[in-house]
Amino acid sequence: MHDAIDEYQIGKIETGEAFRQRFGNPYAVIHRADIHGSLLEGAVETGRVEFFTNTRIEKVEQDDATKTVTAIDQNGKRWVGQALIGADGGKSVVRAQYVNDPPRVTGHVVYRAVVEKADFPDDLKWNAASLWAGPKCHLVHYPLRGGEQYNVVVTFHSRQQEQWGVTDGSKEEVESYFQGICPKARQLIELPKSWRRWATADKEPIGTWVFGRATILGDAAHPTTQYMAQGACMAMEDAVTLGEALRVTNKDWDAALALYQKNRVTRTARIVLSGREMGRLYHAAGVERLVRNSLWKGRSQERFYDAMEWLYGWNVHNCLQQG
């Protein structure tokens, strides 16, 4: 991480072999389309998953006598099963039906773009996830697909009232929020030919994810800001944990759902709340910025790893020991 004002290197975390040795897994980044494609391929290969597109679930009903759940789509068709997993995103229909809690719109806006290798500056072609922390803003870049592309993500505190959602962005807006940063970081916002704009939000963590035979997973359960870079990871952890819970309970759905909730609520709530704090650290201004820089100065890799043990030390073998 660098200071976006003066290029000062605030801290560096080794994510190569030392990271693998400590946590038992590599540190990796992946293109959104590639992870979606990989998950889709894996689901198809099981031969047990059916896909129905252009289908929007609008309501859920449950029958306690038969212990079944019915999902009703936009055409009135009824889909009946033993359980329902609402992995339907931050604006989840399932969560809205059972919890109906409002989003916490942050006022922070994220712009994202992918830049081809040939168009990316040579002096920023680092094989690392790199962050430039500025006052009320920050920039991130990292290689994708073996360095053939680079992801560029910039965040700033909006001057206007925001509505949670995604739209097309404008280069002029981005440039207006990054006037005071150093030239090396500023060149990042001049690269993309087009941007996508996210007005971000999260929700307060909730302690109940299970509603009879219905549950929620991923952003539906714990919508979070991007500051911990763990949204997709937490969704996949949820899925692994639910699968393990079904395995150890011999597919007893009631027991499995209870075990799933017990082992995921605290960890994911910590991600949501930590994300808020990381956003404050990244966007520190004035004296707070100087304090942040001094706190991480000279910190050893072991101290960084110790601080991250709770996050990166998770694996399938301890996923049912988190409650």
Language-model regions: role of each:
Residues 297-323:
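C-terminal auxiliary extensions adjacent to catalytic cores
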Residues 1-44, 282, 295-298:
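Active-site-adjacent segment of FAD-dependent monooxygenases/related oxidoreductases
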Residues 16-23, 156-161, 275:
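Short glycine/proline- and charge-enriched loop/turn segments
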Residues 32, 93-96, 218, 264-268, ...:
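Short, cationic motifs built from Arg/Lys/His that form the positively charged side of catalytic pockets
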Residues 85-86, 111, 141, 194-283:
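Conserved mid-domain beta->alpha element of the FAD-binding
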Residues 6-9, 26-28, 37-193, 206:
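Conserved FAD-binding catalytic core of PHBH/FMO-like flavoproteins
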Residues 13-14, 97-98, 189, 228, ...:
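Short, flexible helix/strand-to-coil boundary loops that buttress conserved ligand/catalytic motifs
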